Amino acid sequence: MSKFTKYFLMEASDVIAYVKEKLSKFEHAKGLKCKEIGDGNLNYVFRVWDKKENMSVIVKQAGDTARISDEFKLSTNRIRIESDVLQLENELAPGLVPKVYLFDSVMNCCVMEDLSNHTILRTALINHQIFPQLADDLTTFMVNTLLLTSDVVMNHKEKKELVKNYINPELCEITEDLVYSEPFTNHNKRNELFPLNEGWIREHIYSDKELRMEVAKRKFSFMTNAQALLHGDLHTGSVFVRDDSTKVIDPEFAFYGPMGYDVGNVMANLMFAWVNADATMPPGAEKDTYMDWLQTTMVEVIDLFKKKFLDAWDIHVTEIMAKEEGFNEVYLQSVLEDTAAVTGLELIRRIVGLAKVKDITCIENEEARARAEQICLKVAKSFILRANQYRTGRSFVETLKEQSMHYAE
């Protein structure tokens, strides 16, 4: 009798038994091994492999609380959302997400392609690796998954069915708290401030009423603007890379929201990589080459996104009023404003809030870390307060470089 007819959190030995029962190609495998490899905040991730037979899979299971904190009570439905979204994204952006082999609504888990021959992008960037096709792949992914799930392209009734299918209240609440509220109010007393910057943050983040007003506006846009199906957590820890391949993973935060949320997350996390390199690499040609590539990548993320977005609009638009001359540019500009604001929000929340990024925390020299944080926080305020001024990739990068040089003076 199967032991997998009632939900429980699996251990490695359970996962081996699970794949042997559920996946025919593993049924008679003799040398299966399993290791829990998850380092995220929410789920349990296992790699199962048979070296002799050269086959492997990933098993991802959802618990009913977040790993980051038991305070976050979560619906295990998020794994259903993730499985569904990955399959949809594979239709919209083929080859840019892992394949899903199985979803199990009883065990609240899914089985998917093993990407062990790739590296987590955040880790690769901290190690100062270069991936020439990164911007091209990420912009293709974002344009195809965002524009093609919007009212511009989809039948409106079908789009509303997707909105209903991807209602994701528990994970949206995490974003509403950790991105749009707590970094500016600390009302839940969970913020973690680096001591050298604590005074500056209290004066220039917590006490800035103009900033808080702009964040309030963006929060309500996030909660009410069901523009497109977002990945919802598109940082560099949600991307696997190798020289010839990019794979976007972990869309468990997916829901219908403003497109710029995904684009802004990508931009902010590339900036974390930039300040990390600025703080940790010794001066010289290697540092110059790497930081130049990061700057070019940031420029291309915005500029390629714009070009591909308008090209895809011309090909796929179905909404009659969206065909009005010039409306595509107006629509795109609103996406870019959201992008700038979210870039700022992500920069602030990862420094002030509960969920840190290794790009910052691994900077061992305290003065260098304080400098990196302040560069991020200062450019973040500009992105939020002057979001309508950021229309090109170069405008983002110039603000980052100017703040870095200003800090050095």
From Swiss-Prot:
InterPro entries: Aminoglycoside_PTrfase, Kinase-like_dom_sf, Methylthioribose_kinase. GO terms for biological process: carbohydrate phosphorylation; methionine biosynthetic process; toxic metabolite repair. Keywords: ATP-binding, Carbohydrate metabolism, Kinase, Nucleotide-binding, Transferase. ATP binds at N43, K60, E113, D114, L115, D250, P251, E252. Substrate binds at D233, R349. Pfam families: APH. Transmembrane segments: none annotated. It catalyses: 5-deoxy-D-ribose + ATP = 5-deoxy-alpha-D-ribose 1-phosphate + ADP + H(+); 5-(methylsulfanyl)-D-ribose + ATP = 5-(methylsulfanyl)-alpha-D-ribose 1-phosphate + ADP + H(+). Its EC number is 2.7.1.-, 2.7.1.100. Catalyzes the ATP-dependent phosphorylation of 5-deoxyribose into 5-deoxy-alpha-D-ribose 1-phosphate, as part of a 5-deoxyribose salvage pathway that recycles this toxic radical SAM enzyme by-product to mainstream metabolites. Is also able to catalyze the phosphorylation of 5-methylthioribose into methylthioribose 1-phosphate, but this enzyme may not function in methionine salvage in B.thuringiensis since it exists a paralog (MtnK) present in the methionine salvage pathway cluster. Does not act on 5-deoxyribulose, 2-deoxyribose, ribose, fucose, fructose, fructose 6-phosphate, and glucose. Belongs to the methylthioribose kinase family. Homodimer. This is 5-deoxyribose kinase. It comes from Bacillus thuringiensis serovar kurstaki (strain ATCC 35866 / NRRL B-4488 / HD73).
